[in-house]
Every structure is written in C-alpha cells, then in structure tokens.
Amino acid sequence: MPKRKNSGQSTDLNSRSPKTIDEALRILAPPQALLVQSQLNLTAPANPFSIQKAPGTSSDNEQRAPKRRADEEAVNAVPKNLLTTSSTFARAVIPAAPAISSANNKMAPQSVTATAKTTTNRGKVSGEGEYQLIKNEVLCSPYGNQYEVLEFLGKGTFGQVVKAWKKGTSEIVAIKILKKHPSYARQGQIEVSILSRLSNENSEEFNFVRAFECFNHKSHTCLVFEMLEQNLYDFLKQNKFMPLPLNAIRPILFQVLTALLKLKSLGLIHADLKPENIMLVDPQQQPYRVKVIDFGSASHRSKAVTNTYLQSRYYRAPEIILGLPFNESIDMWSLGCVIAELFLGWPLYPGSSEYDQIRFIIQTQGLPPTSMLESASKLHRFFKEVKSESPNHTNVGGSYYRLKTVEEYEASSSTAKSKETRKYIFNVIDDISRVCYGFESDPVEHLCDRIDRQEFVDVLKKMLVLNPDFRITPAEGLESKFVTMTHINGYNFANYVHEAHKRMEICRKPGPAMATPYRAANVATPITPVEKPPAPKLQQPMIAVLPQLNQIAATNIPPVPTQPDLTNLMHHYSQMAAATGSAATAAQFFYQPLPPAPLFQYAQLHHPFAARPPHFLSLATPSHMVPQFVPVPIMDPSMLQGQWPPGAAQQFAVLANDIMRVPAPQGINQMFASTPQTFSLPQFLSSSIPSATTAFNGNAPNIPFPEENSSWALGTAAQQQQQQAQRAQSMINGNVKVKPLAAQPKKNSPAPSVITLSSDEDSNGAGSSNSGSTTRTGAVNPVRNDTLPMGNTIKTEDILVPPTTFDGQLPNLQYFPGSHLFDPKTVAGLLPNPFLDTSHIPRAFN
C-alpha cells in the first residue's frame, strides 16, 4: 500500500473522524462564508491545461531556487497560480478572475484564460488513480451546488487543485480533488475531520482557510475551499527571491502565530507549515494579510505517532529527524525557518537529505542535548558514539556522541549524497542580523532597522531551540517585543515605525463582508472597498509650517496643543512691527521657542572638593535628536533671505524669555544690539585658591553651587554679579602667560563675549605643579569638534586635565575633547544650531 509522501500520517484516526467517506461528507457545513484557495505541494508533470507562466528575466536566485518537497525524490515544481510580473516589491499583481462563456446562464463569466488539451477521454481516471479533468466540466455536489472548472492550478502527490465557478452565483472557489486510492481516501477523512472542527471557529480572526463542503465525484473526494491569491513561495519567486523587509515579516508572523495559538488550544498539530502553505489573501487591498492552508498532514496531539514522515525537509524539526516524540512545538520550528527564509530570501537550512539537514542545524545550534540523542530512534543513522576512558561533565558513563562526517555518512548510506545547497553559511544565528542590509540615508530610520533586527533575531533564536521543551510557544511569540513593537515605541515620529503600525493594523482589520473577493467580470455586484486605517497624526513638515504667519504682540507664541512631543521645537515665522516712524512696517523674524529642557546638559557644575560623584554630559531622548528639529532660539537676521527694513535688527529680541527662565528679555545680552552688555565672573569663580590643609581635611569651601546643576542658573548668577570685579581673561593658546584684560573702546558692531578660564599659574610661580594654561568650558558643542580659526572662542586640549589644575578656583566642570567655550549668556540658553551655515553664525556660536 503506497504511503502519502508528504504526510506519513498514521492510519489511526481521530476519535471524531468519520468511519466512511459518506459520514465525512455530512460533517462539513454547507457554504456559508468567504471562499479561499487550498493547495498542498502542487507539482504537475502532466498538466491537463496549458499554464501561462509569468514573464520575467531569470536571476541567479531564480535559477538556483531549491525545490520545495518533503520526500527525497525529484519532482518538478509548478506554479500554484497564474502570475504576472510586478515591478512593485511590496505586493503581487492579482490576475483578473477567469471566466467561461455560457449562453444558457447570464451569471457565467464571459472569457477564459486557460485552454484545455484536446482529448477524447472525458472524466477518465489515470493509472495512478488521478482524475483527468477537462475544460468546462461540471462537478455536482449532493447539496445541489454545481461547480464549473475554469482553470488548473496545480497538482501534488495527493491529487490536484482547480479553480472553479459556482454556477448561479458570482463566487470563485478552489476545489481539491484527491486521487482514487484507499490511502488518500483515509487521508481525506482525516483532513475533513480537522476542517469540520475548524469550521466552528472564526477563520477570519484566526487566519486559517475556510472549507465549505466535501463531496464525491466519480469516486474521488472533492474538498471545496475559499479562493486565495498567492502563496509566499510564489511571491518570493515572483520578486526574484529578494528578502522581505521586517515590516512585512512582522504581520505575517503575527497572523501565523495567531493561527497556531488556536490550533494549540484545540490540540491540533499542522505538521506541514512552509511558505507554500501560507497564502496571501488580497495583496492589493490588504498587503501581507495571510491565511494558513493545507491540513492534510495535521493530526491531534494524542494521535501523534513517532517515526512518521512529517513536514517538508527544509522546515523539519530536529525531533522529527531524530525520530523522537513530538507535539505542537514542531510548528514553531517550521515557522522559525519560514520567517528566516523570508528575511534572507533563501532557506536557512536547505538540506538535500536528512543528514544535511541535521548537519546544517548543528553547525548553527550545536549538538542536541544528550537526553534527546539517547532517546532518538534514528541516532546511529546520523551520529557515532565515542567511548572515553575519562568521563567528565560533557559525557555520561564515559561516552559521548558526535555527528558523522560526510565521508562516514556517504559510506554508510547509499541512497543520498551530501550536497552544499546553502546560500548563507552561519556559525551562529546572531549572524543573520548582519546580512541583507538596506540603504537608509536617514540615521533615525537606520537606527530603527538595527534595533528591529536585534529583536527579530532574538525571537528567531527562541523559535529554533533544539529542545522542544524550551522552545517558545505561540502565546509567548505574540508577546515578544518584535511583534508588539515595544522596542521602537520611542521612535514614533520615524517613518519606519509609522509604516510598521500601518501594516499591522491592515492585517488585524477583517476582510470585506462579502462572499468572496473573486467575482465574475460581468456581474455588477457592488464591491465595498477595504477602508484604509486612519494614519496616526504626525508633525507637520517644516515646509508646510514656514509659510504660516502668526501675529504676535508682546506675548509668547503658545505651543500647539494637538501636536505632542516636538511641538516646542517646530519653526515658526512671526511678524513684528518695526518702529520706523509713525508707520509700523511688518518684518518677518525667525522665531523658535526653546524646549523646557536643553538637548544637552552641558553645564554640570560641581566644586572639585565637593563629595559628589562625577557627572558627564548626557544625551536627550532619541525623539529630540532629529536634525530638522534642532532649536535655534536666537538667530542673526542676516541669516534669513530677504530685505530687512531699517530698525529690524534693533527690534530683534528673545521672545521665549519665560521658557529660558530669565526675568525678562532685557536681562539677557542683546547680541545684535549696538552696545553689548558686559559680564564678569561670579564671586564663586573668582575666589582664591583654598589652602592644602582645607583640602586635605576634607572640608569643602563655602562656595555656592548653581541651582540644580542647571546651566540656566549659571547665566542668572553671572548677571547678578556684574558689579563685582572682573576676572575674565582672554586666552590666546599654548603656554603663553595670561595677561589682564585691557579696556578696549566700544565698537559699533557687537561681538559676543566669551568666558575664558585659566589656572593661577602666574600667581603660583614657575615651580608650581600646574604647568601650562588650560581651559574648561561651560558648554559642549554636540557636533563641531574642529579647531576654530580665530576669535574669542577656543578649542580645549585633547587631553583631559586633572581636577587639581583648577583647585578651588573653578567648579568641577566635566567636559570632553573638542568642547568649546561659550558666553555666560550662551550658557543661559543660547544653544547653537550646528546644522546652519557657519559663515553666517555669530562668533559665540562657532
């Protein structure tokens, strides 16, 4: 009695399985809902219809495409559907529903896309028990339904699948016709029994194919399914086996995990999960909406029998290869191999034999546990026991197992030879994240993709655990970070995250409430389009915000309440009245309100003798690191294009004074005023050096610290100390001694003042331990680290200066090489914008 090659299913039937095929016919309910396609391992050496192959140029991947089979005999692959080449990678092109002309029925389609072979054997059975179909043949069911054959879809070891039209309606269905043989009839009973249990569940919610009815046609079992569009293998083949992005793999993984979770709750094992058995429902309306098909190899958990030929080889779990007892966890292994293939565009373990399959697995996963090997019925087929005289922690009883070499296996087996069929050879699963990188010009998009890859590899490793007891379950997979996307929630402003949420919402959305997405061309049935999910609200692009002019008086511009996150970083144009005589002419000013907290905490001030841990410059959250949202609170009017009326520069003032935490705009140095204000160092910076006794006694001098270590308080403290003696000195560079700052005449063009701090080398003398003049800054430029050519700003040395250099004269400023000095007014809130043209930026911002 021949055995079904792709199944190896036991002859023991489920307790709920029918005893005869007539009982099986009555289990399935009559047609009720949507129609989809169901096929199994469709291969066809002899095709009763001429197949239209999709045009396209063959690529290297297409020529090297491995054959998708479970048995080890060579069978030519055949497309499961008529496809057309699509230039769009994200979705496949759906061909129009074929139709056959009929003068007697007004509901019949009016065209046909497949032609039948000329034959006189109508409805004959071949020598292998396969039914020979012809064009326009009508299959009648006992429920009064008639199905007219439209198109041949494919065939396999079980039989064949055709596309048919349900006469009197506009519905297109898929009919699977099994071979006329007792073994296939029994397998059909098992599939009907499982489908009858699934018919009570919501197929749209749990993402598995919907079956409508089962009947006999000339002693052949016929199963009627709803019609689906295209399987994932054909989708990959159509796109030249290009890898799928993670945003496309995620919804597929989510839907298949949902189906496996339902099967696990029913105690069912699919046992043949592969890309051919995951079908795209409607790529145009619902991209990456999939359903699981082919329950011909499925069984109940209690009826699972070891040493059976289950699963296609590329997706076969190690417990099946070794001949161990199995459960629903074999489907999780298969799903892991499927998503790895979608990510790589090539099977992860494309073994040409079971030996190659287990050899590829061991190369990346290591040897299976000893407990598994000792219980394996096929142990000596692939492994060799090695005796050892010195037992250790790696072996039990002085022996261990190793995989046979290729030469040893070929010498012991005459059926199959080892072949290298892998496109990518990995030593560890983590190396998968290093291949198939796409080009992302946006650093935020690249960062999201990199983080997403790490979580994808993490869930993949949990699905490909050798020990089935520790393999991840469907429920745990649905709670993983890769599926829930909790790891990228902080990047909701990125297009990558927006696209990920959009695709997940589409796959969660139920399909159209109609009988089938396939209808005859001449039937004027209104088709309700699938509603597009509302896109989440994003920040307006800058080009859309700039033309908006806001009238402002003496108050600040309030933030837009409907825009979260980066609202206070959006750029606005404002109009101000320039006091030019009696007529106030309008002038545009570039206004940017400051954020509540600076992007960089660039003034973490501490006294060197204070008993406090060191503080370093910390970055803000990733949502504030977008270049287009870097704040520019104060800007030179000459930086903006256009004519500026007289008096505009004098009217330019800081508008966000309350956000900058200063009493009034007049309290901050007017950088563009005719006479800039002068500043002096605060008292705590100009105090004398504390004595060594005080330092070694551990008593910190009574020096006021800036409030909450905030840079804003530094600017305020600097303004309050303007009347005291100045200690500001100008630093030239190198070892040149510092000279007191000489009074200089005022100039018409203002120049921002810059604090330059130095040690008291002159007062300490040449014999002092402090050699050389060194500076520290109160701010750090986050981008620029090149040497500044001139002016009042200097570049700090590339070597960190010991805290003893400054002693008690200067608070403990933490800085990095390449940091720049800033004016105390700058420290008070004038954060530079490194993305502007430096030729127009004031000196203090360089």
Swiss-Prot record:
Record InterPro entries: Kinase-like_dom_sf, Prot_kinase_dom, Protein_kinase_ATP_BS, Ser/Thr_kinase_AS, Ser_Thr_dual-spec_kinase
Skewed-composition ranges (Low complexity): 764-773
Tissue: Broadly expressed during embryogenesis. Expression becomes more restricted during larval development. L3 larvae display robust expression in many head and motor neurons, and lower levels of expression in the intestine and the seam cells of the hypodermis. By late L4 stage, expression is largely restricted to neurons and is maintained in nerve cells of the head and nerve cord during adulthood. Expressed in adult pharyngeal cells, hypodermal cells, gonadal sheath cells and distal tip cells but not in germline cells.
Region (Disordered): 47-74, 741-790
Keyword annotations: ATP-binding, Autophagy, Developmental protein, Kinase, Nucleotide-binding, Nucleus, Serine/threonine-protein kinase, Transferase
Keyword check for Transcription: no
GO molecular function: ATP binding; protein serine kinase activity; protein serine/threonine kinase activity; protein tyrosine kinase activity
UniProt feature, compositional bias: Polar residues: 746-757
GO BP, sorted A to Z: autophagosome assembly; determination of adult lifespan; response to heat; response to oxidative stress
Biological role stated in the UniProt entry: Serine/threonine-protein kinase required in the somatic gonadal cells to regulate germline proliferation during larval development and in adulthood. Plays a role in the development/differentiation of gonadal distal tip cells. Required for normal lifespan in a pha-4 and mxl-2-dependent manner. Also contributes to survival following heat or oxidative stress. Prevents sumoylation and inactivation of heat shock transcription factor hsf-1 which enhances hsf-1-dependent transcriptional induction of chaperones in response to heat shock.
Name of this chain's protein: Homeodomain-interacting protein kinase 1
